[in-house]
Structures are given as structure tokens and as C-alpha cells.
Amino acid sequence: MEGGEELFRVSSARLSSSNVWRNSAMDVFSRSSREADDEEALKWAALEKLPTYLRIRRGILTEEEGQSREVDITKLDLVERRNLLERLIKITDEDNEKFLLKLKERIDRVGLDLPTIEVRFEHLSVDAEARVGSRALPTVFNFTVNILEDFLNYLHILPNRKQPLPILHDVSGIIKPGRMTLLLGPPSSGKTTLLLALAGKLDKDLKVSGRVTYNGHDMNEFVAQRSSAYISQYDLHIGEMTVRETLAFSARCQGVGAKYEILAELSRREKEANIKPDPDVDIFMKAAWNEGQEANVVTDYTLKILGLEICADTIVGDEMVRGISGGQRKRLTTGEMMVGPARALFMDEISTGLDSSTTYQIVNSIRQSIHILQGTAVISLLQPAPETYDLFDDIILLSDGQIVYQGPRENVLEFFEYMGFICPERKGVADFLQEVTSRKDQEQYWARREESYKFITVREFSEAFQAFHIGRKLGDELAVPFDKSKSHPAALTTKRYGVSKKELLKACTAREYLLMKRNSFVYIFKMIQLTLMASITMTLFLPTEMHRNTTIDGAVFLGALFYALIMIMFNGFSELALSIMKLPSFYKHRDLLFFPPWAYALPTWILKIPITLVEVAIWVCMTYYVIGFEADVGRFFKQLLLLICVNQMASGLFRLMGALGRNIIVANTFGSFVLLTVLVMGGFVLSRDDVKKWWIWGYWISPMMYAQNAIAVNEFLGKSWAHVPPNSTSTETLGVSFLKSRGIFPDARWYWIGAGALIGYVFLFNFLFAVALAYLNPFGKPQAVLSEETVAERNASKRGEVIELSSLGKSSSEKGNDVRRSASSRSMSSRVGSITAADLSKRRGMILPFEPLSITFDDIRYAVDMPQEMKAQGFTEDRLELLRGVSGAFRPGVLTALMGVSGAGKTTLMDVLAGRKTGGYIDGTISISGYPKQQETFARIAGYCEQTDIHSPHVTVYESLQFSAWLRLPREVDTATRKMFIEEVMELIELIPLRDALVGLPGVNGLSTEQRKRLTVAVELVANPSIIFMDEPTSGLDARAAAIVMRTVRNTVDTGRTVVCTIHQPSIDIFDAFDELLLLKRGGEEIYVGPLGRQSSHLIKYFEGIDGVPKIKDGYNPATWMLEITSVAQEGALGNDFTELYKNSELYRRNKALIKELSVPASCSKDLYFPTKYSQSFFTQCMACFWKQHWSYWRNPPYTAVRIMFTFFIALMFGTIFWDLGSRRERQQDLLNAIGSMYIAVLFLGVQNATTVQPVIAIERTVFYRERAAGMYSAMPYAFGQVMIELPYLFLQTIIYGVIVYAMIGFEWTVAKFFWYLFFMYFTLLYFTLYGMMTVAVTPNQSIAAIISSAFYAVWNLFCGFIVPKTRMPVWWRWYYYICPISWTLYGLIASQFGDIQDRLDTNETVEQFIENFFDFKHDFVGYVALILVGISVLFLFIFAFSIKTFNFQKR
């Protein structure tokens, strides 16, 4: 082959018009250009001679020096790909379009058509079902009733009580190729549902009618998920992978679609027509359109156009590990689908968290690709800036599930003028469109002054659009069906996956291996934990203490073997959490058809086998000979093999539990339940002879039984157990008689039966894991919850009636007294000048007086210790300064914007002023109305709205406000006044319709982002503060929601409060609402501090007065212009230092004078003073915290109800398994069976309680940090509320378990024994729950808490006195027995039940003697044991409260 290529190079030379195509910068050669062209022509000629398959895999690559060489495109390295892209696209904004045009020109030259997709939807309706009103709240009662109701509905016994919730109503339209479509609409208008319907990804639970077609083909004729790409608004990624790896994996799974065939055809036609392409474009297309490449040039191209090159090799990160920023994560979500071959893109809110310039750049690059390569795109955006809005060709406006307008962007304002509405001059069209259909905002745009305004409903708009000329034209087009013969054969995909199954398996294997390397600390930690536990086990079962004389010696050996099984089995438990962590991104990839579920499941299993080998080898090598098991190398390896099988079986089982549970709390409960069943039925806790006939099937299917039998047979049929004990009446060896006494089969073949069964289980569990992944969907989808008011409002809207907003959510008596007021609302720019009746109505109710206060700060500096990474880069300073001498004054009734680019120090300045910083060095002076700031008093008069909206998820909106007002308003305010004030704030912030809505968790359920944001403002406002800080109150909101929040903020300022907002990229509207501006540049220095003026006139005048600064264009956003002209690049170009210019300006001198004036107290004023640190007494704080926790627990059935149900099922299971064993006292084994039931119940119920309480405490702790910083309460009342609420639930749990089990097992019915049983169970559950809380309180996050607590469970289990009785422990370990909480529980339970029984056993000793000799338990000591358990609970409670008070893991 090589020789042939040489021959072609020498023998044929063809001069070509390469200069037309060549980049002129390449002509810098050492030889003449002509010579180089000749040489290149030879290379091309050689390429032309190759067969097509090889020709499209080879290309001519030009190197940096200008030399060109022939390369195999599958072997391009990172540097070569980077250089190629650098030549094609040097500056993304300018060169991407040129590059795409070159690419299109090449395709057009040979007359090839690119595949295009036209998407039509006709009469599409989507309906869901929802519960209404209080029945929709997830209380323990509703949870139970709903389960029963759904079951009876399923059996058609009860009618369905859910109400229909229409999401989309009879929508029709056409999405054309080569055009960009913008989808707009207020929240809950059905945008996401429409995009999902178009992408063929609607949920199976929804009722869908109508049809969606691609090029005239119905969805069942092709694979929609691969022909189009849906980009979700949720950023679900694996945190341990880098940005480049995430994109490369996506590209590898999606393949290149039909591009390979197009490339082959293109190459064939070019060869026939004798056309030589541009070498760079040629090599790019070959590298991008060839299948089966691990690192594709498409990945690099996507990184470049999305501006992700800067973080390409940074890990994505998650809430635990710091990674890329929110904006970069959003772009990664977009890029993940753009690297694929899909020709239609449906993008859902891709701009959240991005600044307007980045959004513009991304949308522009998508637009270039759509226009030039004839793709299809529908993009929904939240707050598109005017310049981004102008990039689109078509607009779809949705409202209340109906299409109000669909057609060219140019005609949209014409339609609304035809309806009587005009967009004001300084208003973005997109913002206008989102507000004009809303009842609250519509009136301000009414233009027909001669006619009185009447609210126009969405249905009226929709009907009017059908009659409008654009609507008629659309109807005519839809009436003519698409001509299927015009559809390109490659446009729609019929193959389910992008590449071959083998390739997908390789891709998943490579990713799993990568994740294992990234998570190596987990495996190292597990090995260290195993080594530590092996060391403890070795020293506990030392050969000097281990004899082989009696069956009791055998029991200790069996205990050691059983513990080895438990340790190896529990070692697989981490698989459960690791599986669940990866599930969200797995479901996303599965639903997008990246890979079949088995390709994901197989590597997850196979790659863990080597780790199992190492872990088990550590355990067996350390313990086998030291403990003194049978000294036979064959038996050593047999134990090793068996434990490897056990570990693999356990890992498979826990992976399966993760895939079935799909949620960490549910999976933990499932996992515990299964583990419990497997262990109880394993033959150690309860011997085979004592298993009831109705449970014997459980014994035969328990994997632990096979493991227990095999490992026991391996040990007890060895030579050292082959002697007949002295005084024995039978001829059986000690080993055989011991096995028989414990109900184990004394047959050597049982080793191989056990090992075979375990291997069978390994395959079964992993197979079921793959099946669960394939068929189950994500757990706990966001549920639609409708309030009665929402239903009424929707129905009224449909009928065109107007319903009073302020009356929604009030009782009928209140409604009668309500002051009727117009729902109109002034636009924000006009509000500054005039106060309307509506505004007066808003002001009237601020019934609580407050003192207007100003805040001044002078020369504020803030520094932190220099990070190690920066020191490594050569920074020598000890401190990194984030704020450098910032000064300013914020006054009552003035709304100040705090602005600057990312990293300028906006939030830092706000945190410093509000006293929220937990570390660092602060200098400078801060005064409140002239008096030095004292943080304790300041917290009482200030509110701080954080950027992340942190609220307790299980309370309603009204309860959140009630709680805040209760704890933050002064004691003098009575309940009635407080309630009136809350109503007032709710009206001001437009929360009345949401009064009974559950807050929920962000992105999961409950309130939308915008509603959550308003709640954050309201929670601070009900505290009646004089000064309010708000950190980015409009980030992540659409224009309409941002307008509502800003209207709220403006209303707040108009009451005479001092309000400061950091703001990122405000629209003209939002910017106009501010009175003053403090502008920072990167590095924390001020550039402008002063008034904005009407339509930002003062700001514009100041900057336009600086030499070289370009004038602002008409209608351009002053905020965007200001950030552009003060950027680092502009500063460098102008040669100006804006900080210096400001410091030398008249404005600076005026500000300094103002600061000086406000820093002196007014003559009649006095300093702030409060007699107590908190506004409410300690008792009230405790009551309030308890009240909130009560609602939080009552509405958290996944925690409370599941725990009670789990206990109920375990009680029934134990009762039936250990039926009547408590009354049998003939043999030692009878007692051990009854004691085993106590041991296993204590261990599992306790661990279950401790595990499930951890996530609850972790979520509440973040809320606690916010509420404590706001001065609502101290740490002790919080700890009181958190612990007190557990007591009744634990009591219920104890009663359910205690009564059922005590009766069924048949313990002795005396009042004292029954009371002691309940007492010990109650305090055991209590200390376990407190232990779970304590571990969260002393660790930074829930994951570390889980790891630490699980390590202790293993040790507690070993030293509890059941596996090894205290009498058989070496002296040096007995101290641990005394500090192990479970040992005292077992002491109390066993001694209280059996410690005074005089019945004789078959060994001729009484039960009391056996208990004392074997366990060293005395009945007289029960009272002291009770006190010790109370003491343990108090100790854990104290550590929890102390840690919550002392440790603050929130770093600011």
C-alpha cells in the first residue's frame, strides 16, 4: 500500500486552483509558493487514487510551519485538532459563519442536498391529572389515603378524584427548516410540554391527542429521539467528569448519523468532477463525519463556539465538589446535544445563568448553523435581550397552553396593534410579548384611549390570530399535507442507536473506568476501613482465647465467620449510593437513546470485580491464620473464593436496590429491609430447625444461608474439629455435632452448593439491575398541584370573566370587606414620577412603623488568604485583596443597584456590609445613620435576600412568612397585628394566590423559581427591616417574572426603606427602576457611584464625557453599554483607568461629602439599642421552631410515613419468623433464637432511623444557617425543635413494633417486662436517631456523615455482645464493650426478659445461670442499664446541639 502511494506521488502531478481555496497566511514558505503547490498537487493526486473507503479517512494536514503532510484523520492528536480549528475559526464571532459558508459551498458545488426536517403539529392537546387543594399537600394522612385511593382506582372500585389539568389546548403550527424559531410565554404556559411533544419525549402518564409529524411522517415511522435533539432546562451531568470528557462521551454515543454517507458521496462526486477542496475544510469534514472516533474534532469545535475552551479540562462538579460555574454548566447541557448529528434542535431555556453577551454569541452561532446548513430549531428563552431577540426569524407566543401568535418576527407587533396594544419605546419586544397576555400587566399597553379597556383573554387572542392574515396563511399551509417524496432519505433516522452496540459498550466501559479512577478515594477508604476492621477482628478473636473443646467454642468460631460474612456483605453497600448518584444522568442518556441500559449495567459490574478481589484478599489474608481457622491452605483459598462470591452478590443486590428505589431514602429503606430478611434467614440468628414452615421458603432463597452453610462446612469439617469431645455420649466429631446443633448441613458438598448458588445470585441480581434500568423511570416526578383558586381562575379565564386577584385565597368574610382595586399596574419607568391609587392602596397597609435608616461605608477593604493554587502559579503575596477601598452611602427611599462583571466583588461587598462573611480580613468603617455598626443590633433591622432561595421545603408560603414574622417582629406586636402585617406583605409581593402552596425543593416540586424568589423577598420583608440587601433578585427569571420581582422591590423602596440589589444583566426596564448605581470593576474597585437619572441620563453623561468612549446607540440598553465600555479590553484600548478617572471626578468629591454628612448622627437621633439579642424569648423561639418542625415532618411522608410502614412490616415479619420462640426454654439455642430477634431488630431499626434522618437534617441545616444569620433564633431552640418533634414519631414507632413483636414472639406477659421492653426499644431508637443527627452536625455534608456513621455501625455490631459474648472477649477489648451503646440495649432487653427465670435447660443449668455465665448479665442491674441508655441519648443530644451551635460549614 505504502509503495503504491509513493508511486502515485511521483508519477502524477496535477496543478490546481488551490490558491483560490488556500488561506493566504499559509504562503509563508521557505521555498516558493509554486513549488509547494506542486508538491501538494502530487499528494492530492496520490489521495485521489485510493478507494473511497480509504480516501475519506485520509487528508492533507498543513502544519504550523506551513509544511503539509498526508495524515490518517482517525489519528489526529489534540494539538493538531487545535491548530486546525485555530486556522478555520480564529475569532468565533467573526469566523464561524465564514467557515460554515465554505463548508456549504463545498457541498453545493457538487449539487448535493443536505437532509432537512419540517416539523408540523396539528390539533395537539396535552392533559395531565392533578389533585386539588389541601388534598394535594403531601401530608402523612394524604400520602396514606392517596396510596389506597390509587389502588382502588386501579381496580375500578372508586371513581378517579383527580381534576384534569390542560397543559396544551388544540395547538397547531409548522416549524420550517433554515429558520430560527423563538418560543416565548409566561411561566406554566406549556413551553416545555410543547418542546417535549415536538421531540417525541412526552411522559406516558399524559393524555395526548392530535399529531406531530416530521416531513409528513408520523412519530411511529422513525426514531424521533435520534432525528431531533431535546435540550433540557435541567443541567444533569456526572460531576467527576471534565467538560471535554462529557462532550466526547456524548459525541461517541450519538455517532455521525447520515454524515458518513454524505461524505462518501461528496468525495465520489468531487473525484468525478475533478474538484480539489480546501484542505482544511476537507480534513475537518473527514474528521468530524467519520464514525467511531473517541476524541472527535466536533468536540473541540463545540467547545470553541460555546466559549467552553477555558474550562474544557475542569471537572463539571456538583453540590459537593466545586467545578464549573452555573453558566458554563448550562452551555455544557447545550453542547452535549449539539455534538450529535440531530437535524432538529428543541432547546428549553438555554440562557439561564448566562449574561446577555454570552447568550447572544451562542444563539448567533446556532443561527449561523441553522441558516447555512438548513437545520430546524425551536428555542425557548427566559429574558432575551433585544439584540438576541432580533436573531430569530419566527416567534411562537404561548400562554395558558394556547398559541397566541406564530409567524415571522416582523409581523408580531402588527398583530398586537391590530388587537389594540402597543409596545412602548424603551421596552424590549420579548418582554412586552410575555406581559401583554397577563391579567396583571395587560392594561398598561392598551392603546385605544377612546375605548374603555377590557381584559382580553388568551382564548380571544388565539381566535383573533386565526383571523389575522399570518394566522390564515398558516392555516392554509397546514391544510396542504407535506409531500413525503420531497423528504431526504437521510433526514429521519430509523436506527435506534447512533453507533454499533459494541462501540457503545466500549464507550460505557471507558467512562465507567474513568469514574472509578476519579472516585478512587471511595475504594481506598473502603480498603482502609476493611483493614482497620480486620485488625480489630484479629485482636478480638485471638488464638490464645480460641479453643476447640466444646460447642460454645464452636459458637465463637461461628461468630467470627458470621462477622466476616457481614463485613464483606456490608462492604457492597456503597454501591447503592454510587448507583443512585449516577441515575439522573443515566436516565437522561437512556431517554435520549445514547446507549442501551445493558451497555451501562455490564461495565458497572465487570469493572468492580478486580476491586472485590483485592478487598476480600486483604480481609482473608489478615484474619484467617491470626484468628486460627483451620490451618489448611486448600480451606484458606476456599474461604477466599466464597467471600469473593459474597461480595459480588452483595454489590449486585445493592445496585439492584438502588435501581429499584431511585431515591436515596427509599433505596436505603428497601436495602435495609432486604438485608434484614437475608440475614435473619441466613441461619445464624435463627437456626434452620427453628424456622417456621410458612417461612422455610425464605430460608431456601436467602443468599446468606448458602454463604453461612458453605463457610461453616469449610471450617468445621477440618482436621482440628475431627475429635470426639470428652464426656460425649455420641460418636460424632465435635465439628459435626456443633453443625447439627446450629441447624447447618454437616456435609462437605454443601461448600460447592453454596458457592454455586452465590454465583447464580451474582448473575441474577446483575441481570435484574439491567432490567430495572431499562424499564423504570426516575422516581418522584414533579407533581402538578392545583389550589382551588387556580382552578377557579383557569375556568374564569376560559369563560373570559375577571376574577379579583386580591380576593383569591381569602375567606368569604374577608372577601366581602376587601377594598376592590384595579388590577392595573404602572410600568416601572413611569412609576418613579407618579403615584397611583393602586400604589396608595399598596402603601396604606404598612401598619407597622419602622425607622428609616441610612448605611454609609468608607474605604472598605476585604482580603482572604492567598489560595494555594495561585501561590503555585507564582503569586508571592500572603493575601488576595477582593475589595480595594470602596466607599458609598445607601439612603432610605432610594433603590441602589450594585453592578459589575463576574468576579468584581458585588456579592462580597454586600456580604461584608451585611456582616455575613465567615472568614477573611475586613478594614474600613461602616455606620448606620451615623452610629458605628454593631452586628447584633444590625441583624434586627436588616434583611438579606440571598441569591439561592433557601427555605424549608415542607411548609406552605403562608407558614414560611408566619414563622419569620413570629420570630423577627418585636414582642410588643400582638398576634392580630402580626397577621394583618403578613397579609399586607403578601399583597404587596403578590403572593396571595400562593398562600397555601407548598414551598418544595428547587427543581423538584413546589414553587417555581420566580415564586421562590418573591417568597425570599417576603420572608425578609415581614421582619419589617429598615435596610434590605438583595443578591441578584432577578437571576434565572423570565422577563415577566423579573418585572413582578422588581415591582415588589420598587414597592418596598416606596415605603421608605433602604434597598440595595446586586444585579447581573438587567433589561432596560429593570435598570430604569433603579435610582442610583454603584459600579465595580474586576478587582473590587469602584468606577461609578452616583445617581442614574431619568432613562440613565446622568450615567450616560458621565461616561460619554470621558475621552474615547463611544456614544450610546438609540434604544440600546444603558446597562449593557456601560459594562461593554468599562470592560478590561476597552480599558486597555482606551489607555484609561476608570477607577482613577472616578477618584479625580467631581462626582467622587460629592459622594465623599455625602458620606461625611451621613456619618454624623442627626441631632435628635439616638443609637440603635435592643435589650435582648433576639426579638423573642427563648421559650417562644423553642415553640416556633417546634411548630415549624411539626409541619415539616407531617408533610414529609417519604421520611415519616415510610419509617412507620417499614417498622410495621418488620414487626409483622419478625413476629411470624420468631413466632412463639420467646416462650420456649428447653435448649440454649431456644434462648439464642429469642435473643437473636432482639439483636437483629435493634441493629436494623436503629441503623435505619439513623440513616434516614441524615438527609432531613442536612436539608434543614442550610435553612438554619440562613435563619440564624438573620437573627431569628439561637442554635439551642433549633436543636430543641429538631429533637422534640422526633419524640412522638419514635413513640409511635416503638408502640407499633413493641406491641406486635412482644405479642407474636410470646415473651412473658407481665407489666414490668412489657414496660422494660418498650422502654429499652424507645431509648434505643432515640439514641440511634440522635446519633444520625449528630453525625450530620459534626461533618460538612451528608455523604461524609454517612461514611463516618457506617464505620461505627460495623464496630458496634462486633462489640454488642451477641457475635462474641463479653465473657469471651480479650481483656484489652472489654473497655469498648462498655462504651458500645448497642451492648447496653441488649443487656437491658435480655436481662429484663430472661434474667430472673428459673426454668432448667437441657444442660441442667437454669436460664438465669446461663444468661449470667454466657453473657455476664444480671437482672438486678436493669435499672442502672436504663439510666445508662438515657445518659447515652443525652450525650448524643448535647453533641448535636453543641456542634450546631459551634460549627459553621457554610463558607462565605
Curated annotation (Swiss-Prot):
Please tell me in which tissues this protein is expressed: Expressed in root hypodermal passage cells. Expressed in stem tissues, particularly the vasculature and nodes adjacent to leaf axils.
Q: Which PROSITE patterns does the record associate with it?
A: ABC_TRANSPORTER_2 (PS50893)
- Please state where this protein is localized: Cell membrane
Query: Per the database record, which ranges form the ABC transporter domain?
Result: 152-425, 855-1107
Q: Name one GO cellular component term.
A: plasma membrane
Q: Which UniProt keywords apply?
A: ATP-binding, Cell membrane, Membrane, Nucleotide-binding, Repeat, Transmembrane, Transmembrane helix, Transport
Q: Which SUPFAM superfamilies match?
A: P-loop containing nucleoside triphosphate hydrolases
Gene ablation phenotype (knockout): Enhanced branching phenotype. Defective in strigolactone exudation from roots, and reduced symbiotic interactions with arbuscular mycorrhizal fungi (AMF).
The record ties this protein, via Gene3D superfamilies, to:
P-loop containing nucleotide triphosphate hydrolases
Which GO annotations describe the biological process of this protein? hormone transport; regulation of secondary shoot formation
Instruction: Give the matching CDD domains.
Output: ABCG_PDR_domain1, ABCG_PDR_domain2
| Record field: compositional bias (Basic and acidic residues) | 812-821
| The ABC transmembrane type-2 domain, residue ranges | 504-716, 1180-1394
- Family per similarity comment: Belongs to the ABC transporter superfamily. ABCG family. PDR (TC 3.A.1.205) subfamily.
**UniProt cross-references to PANTHER family, sorted A to Z:** PLEIOTROPIC DRUG RESISTANCE PROTEIN 1-LIKE (PTHR48040:SF45), PLEIOTROPIC DRUG RESISTANCE PROTEIN 1-LIKE ISOFORM X1 (PTHR48040)
Descriptive protein name: Pleiotropic drug resistance protein 1
Species of the source:
Petunia hybrida
